[in-house]
């Protein structure tokens, strides 16, 4: 891996329906094997299901879910004197939303409902209400960071 400079961040166009870059990145994370139309159909159908079943604004529910699942701390492995330490570090905005979308998608795919549309709709609704597997993943990450607070002086970057 080259160490000269970091790769440039690609410009991601906002989605057509809600004009949101965050939602567009979420759709890209759902996408498998380049099937973006199918990923969009899954997300927008899940939004329709949220709107019909719970009678709430689906886009606002999505934003609340992403905000609730987004971690503030995580642990990174740092090697010091032949030992690896789990050092708590702050998570920047972009990585936080990336982790949140990954956790929501993984939690949704492991649910017991039959179709991904139903799984995603329920997981987003639960995450927006601070419940569900994705929220538990965030809490576990924060607990791990809190437990390793003693190693924060090994931090590779300033907190």
From Swiss-Prot:
- The answer to whether UniProt assigns keyword Ligase to this entry is no
Instruction: Provide the Gene Ontology terms for cellular component.
Output: small ribosomal subunit
Presence of the UniProt keyword Calcium in the record? no
Tell me one GO biological process term. Answer: translation
- Keywords, ordered alphabetically: Ribonucleoprotein, Ribosomal protein, RNA-binding, rRNA-binding, tRNA-binding
Q: Please give one Pfam family short name.
A: Ribosomal_S7
The residue range of the signal peptide is none
Q: What InterPro entries does this protein's entry cite?
A: Ribosomal_uS7, Ribosomal_uS7_bac/org-type, Ribosomal_uS7_CS, Ribosomal_uS7_dom, Ribosomal_uS7_dom_sf
Q: Which GO terms describe its molecular function?
A: rRNA binding; structural constituent of ribosome; tRNA binding
What function does the entry list? One of the primary rRNA binding proteins, it binds directly to 16S rRNA where it nucleates assembly of the head domain of the 30S subunit. Is located at the subunit interface close to the decoding center, probably blocks exit of the E-site tRNA.
According to the record's subunit comment, the protein's assembly and interactions are: Part of the 30S ribosomal subunit. Contacts proteins S9 and S11.
- Which family does the entry's similarity section mention? Belongs to the universal ribosomal protein uS7 family.
Can you say what this protein is called? Small ribosomal subunit protein uS7
Which species does this protein come from?
A: Rickettsia felis (strain ATCC VR-1525 / URRWXCal2) (Rickettsia azadi)
* Organism lineage string: Bacteria, Pseudomonadati, Pseudomonadota, Alphaproteobacteria, Rickettsiales
């Amino acid at each position: 891996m080259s160490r000269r400079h970091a790769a440039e961040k690609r410009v991601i166009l906002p989605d057509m329906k809600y004009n949101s870059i965050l939602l567009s990145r979420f759709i890209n994370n759902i996408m498998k094997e380049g099937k973006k139309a199918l990923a969009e159909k899954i997300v927008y159908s899940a939004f329709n299901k949220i709107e019909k079943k719970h009678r709430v604004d689906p886009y606002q529910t999505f934003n609340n879910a992403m905000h609730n699942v987004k971690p503030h701390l995580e642990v990174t492995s740092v090697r010091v004197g032949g030992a690896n330490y789990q050092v708590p570090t702050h998570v920047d905005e972009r990585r936080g939303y990336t982790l949140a979308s990954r956790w929501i998608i993984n939690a949704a795919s492991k649910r017991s409902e039959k179709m991904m549309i139903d799984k995603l709709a329920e997981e987003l609704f639960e995450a927006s209400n601070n419940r569900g597997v994705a929220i538990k993943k965030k809490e576990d990450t924060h607990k791990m960071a809190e437990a390793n607070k003693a190693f924060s002086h090994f931090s590779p970057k300033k907190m």
